[in-house]
């Protein structure tokens, strides 16, 4: 599938942002590294993560119009975050902000409140294999029915993770998702070896990162 014009623009904007980050990293190294300038290191860590996340969305953005809109919205937000951290600290970064001037129309379009409002309740197609769709549905249902109703109490009172949450996750196989089958887990190796664990973590985190999403990663 050929890329839409907006996805092509997003790819160009992301490439420019990555180049700016690379330049700033070199500036940071030349100035003594993170210990000598923790503010720049902190900002770069955030921006670099957003740039790479936006880049990873490009393939997804080529799968359809909604996917493209989601990708472009994230890329535009990434640019906004980059610029907000850069302006006033250009010398610290060693970067010229005008490199992103050509991205203005793209950011204006995809950060428009009306566009984001129309997008906010849209669930992007997941494009998962059938087995992973089943994993997602299973853990989304469990998170909604079991984790979410208990989350506020645990967070508000700094309570322990309820035993029924732990035992319930054990019953549906949460703690064996990344364990190889030869050790009585569910991971069969291959390219998607840990995908089920990632999907389960994401769905549990929707309800509560503290008593859901973090459990199986610990």
Model-assigned labels for residue ranges:
Residues 1-212, 216:
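Flavin-dependent oxidoreductase catalytic core characteristic
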């Amino acid at each position: 599938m050929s890329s839409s014009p907006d996805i092509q623009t997003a790819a160009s904007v992301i490439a420019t942002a990555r180049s700016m980050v690379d330049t700033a990293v070199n500036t940071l190294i030349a100035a003594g590294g993170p210990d000598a300038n923790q503010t720049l290191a902190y900002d770069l860590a955030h921006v670099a993560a957003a740039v790479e996340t936006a880049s990873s969305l490009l393939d997804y953005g080529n799968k359809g119009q909604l996917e493209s809109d989601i990708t472009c919205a994230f890329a535009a937000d990434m640019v906004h975050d980059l610029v907000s951290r850069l302006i006033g600290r250009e010398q610290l970064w060693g970067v010229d902000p005008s490199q992103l001037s050509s991205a203005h129309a793209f950011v204006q379009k995809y950060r428009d409140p009306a566009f984001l409002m129309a997008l906010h309740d849209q669930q992007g197609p997941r494009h998962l294999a059938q087995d992973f769709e089943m994993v997602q549905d299973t853990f989304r249902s469990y998170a909604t029915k079991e984790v979410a109703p208990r989350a506020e109490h645990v967070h508000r009172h700094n309570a322990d993770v309820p035993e029924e949450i732990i035992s319930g996750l054990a019953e549906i196989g949460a703690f064996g998702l990344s364990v190889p089958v030869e050790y009585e887990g569910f991971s069969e190796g291959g390219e998607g070896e840990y995908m089920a664990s990632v999907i389960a973590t994401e769905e549990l985190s929707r309800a509560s990162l503290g008593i859901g999403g973090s459990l199986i990663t610990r």
